[in-house]
């Protein structure tokens, strides 16, 4: 059995396999300022209550602070939902991106996580089954605590080799190129291999985050000592809690797993990767795009706005200035990340370099505010999507890369991984 088959089998209490349609009890449900109002409107038509307010998380992150009257009205309606049903796990604007908030506070191995956002797949990094749902489905989940799902097939991706120049973002872009934008439609992408086994949680979250860019239902990684260490140090779980999680740990026997496809990627000789307009699977080695002039750089998002990402970017910006023709926007993924970056002097480095620092949230990723692109402008971004018109004008251009490449390129004024 694959990892998702085992997780879902444990959830329902009997053995399931790819293709089975099952009803599942949800452990954690989340919507944000964009999807809570839609789910709330649908909920009103089916129920006067929610199944468990303590298992519902609402986070304002897409338009924070509200940048239009419509955005303000949406948040007003979402806040009505929060107050009406006594949702204690409410995170107002400025606390961070919903997925970073879930990672910092809520998700545990073996959970079934339902989110009103397509990048809910991020949380498979904890050894959970996490996936996105539409507003009507989220309304039903809020009302009943249940949903149905077809057990997805699984693509196994093993990352092997050694290469200190390659980041998790480079790896997941390479995987996107290999699988393609529709190659994993309604499938789970199960990551493994020595590189993943030694990767920290920030990197694993980046890998799983972009499963949806390949059409995936979720990305998933076995929980292990790195997972438990994160939960203990970053989340404050007790030794007793960790021991219980270890006892319930789910692992995969490769010889018994029935995968739709198995892929191995050796990063030993791999160049750093860049996705070029207008799809995340349109990926090229950086040598193919080096020298492309840019107007804007964005470092942030649920893909690469975590503390390790900001630390990496700061290494290349320290003592340097952003190119005169480039706007550099930096948005920490959460308040917690922001505060620690302040404490470490990282924000000081960014500000002195000439960066604009914005409220923790999604920022320009969705093209709503805080860095919208004009016609013909080119942005190098650490986000996950570079669709046509995604960040502004329909005739603007987005390249995707790692925080390292983003920082260096901001200094040079063109896409590069070289400072000298």
Swiss-Prot record:
Pathway the protein contributes to: Organic acid metabolism; 2-oxosuberate biosynthesis
Cofactor detail note: Binds 1 [4Fe-4S] cluster per subunit.
Enzymatic reactions: (2R)-homocitrate = (2R,3S)-homoisocitrate; (2R)-homocitrate = cis-homoaconitate + H2O; (2R,3S)-homoisocitrate = cis-homoaconitate + H2O; cis-(homo)2aconitate + H2O = (2R,3S)-iso(homo)2citrate
pH dependence per the UniProt record: Optimum pH is 9. Active from pH 8 to 10.
Cofactor requirements of the protein: [4Fe-4S] cluster
Quaternary state and interactors: Heterotetramer of 2 HacA and 2 HacB proteins.
Protein name: Methanogen homoaconitase large subunit
Gene this chain is encoded by: hacA
């Amino acid at each position: 059995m694959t990892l998702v088959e085992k997780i879902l089998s444990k959830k329902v209490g009997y053995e399931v396999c790819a293709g089975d349609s099952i009803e599942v009890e949800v452990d954690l449900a989340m919507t944000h300022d964009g999807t809570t109002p839609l789910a709330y409107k649908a909920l009103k038509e089916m129920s006067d209550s929610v199944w468990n307010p303590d298992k519902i998380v609402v986070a304002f992150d897409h338009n924070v602070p509200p940048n239009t009257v419509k955005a303000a009205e949406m948040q007003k309606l979402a806040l009505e939902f929060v107050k009406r049903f006594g949702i204690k796990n409410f995170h107002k604007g400025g606390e961070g991106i919903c997925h970073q908030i879930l990672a910092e506070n809520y998700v545990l191995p073996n959970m079934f996580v339902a989110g009103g956002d397509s990048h809910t797949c991020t949380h498979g990094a904890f050894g959970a089954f996490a996936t996105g749902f539409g507003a009507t489905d989220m309304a039903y989940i809020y009302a009943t605590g249940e949903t149905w799902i077809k057990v997805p097939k699984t693509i196994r991706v093993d990352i092997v080799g050694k290469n200190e120049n390659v980041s998790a973002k480079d790896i997941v872009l390479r995987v996107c190129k290999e699988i393609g934008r529709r190659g994993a439609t309604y499938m789970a992408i199960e990551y493994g291999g020595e590189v993943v086994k030694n990767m920290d949680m920030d990197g694993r979250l980046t890998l799983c985050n972009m499963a949806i860019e390949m059409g995936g239902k979720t990305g998933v990684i076995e929980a292990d000592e790195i997972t438990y260490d994160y939960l203990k140090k970053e989340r404050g779980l007790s030794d007793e809690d960790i021991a219980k999680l270890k006892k319930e740990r789910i692992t995969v026997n490769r010889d018994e797993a029935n995968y739709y496809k198995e892929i191995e990627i050796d990063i030993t000789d791999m160049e750093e990767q860049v996705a070029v307009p207008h799809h995340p699977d349109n990926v090229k080695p950086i040598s193919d795009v080096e020298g492309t002039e840019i107007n804007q750089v964005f470092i942030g998002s649920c893909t690469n706005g975590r503390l390790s990402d900001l630390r990496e970017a700061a290494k290349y910006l320290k003592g340097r200035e952003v190119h005169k023709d480039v706007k550099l926007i930096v948005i920490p993924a959460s308040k917690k990340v922001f505060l620690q970056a302040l404490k470490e002097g990282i924000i000081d480095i960014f500000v002195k370099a000439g960066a604009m620092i914005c409220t923790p949230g999604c920022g320009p990723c969705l093209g709503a505010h805080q860095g919208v692109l004009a016609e013909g402008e080119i942005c190098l971004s650490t986000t996950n999507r570079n669709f046509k018109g995604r960040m502004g004008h329909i005739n603007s251009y987005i390249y995707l890369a790692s925080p390292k490449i983003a920082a260096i390129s901001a200094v040079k004024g063109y896409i590069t991984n070289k400072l000298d």
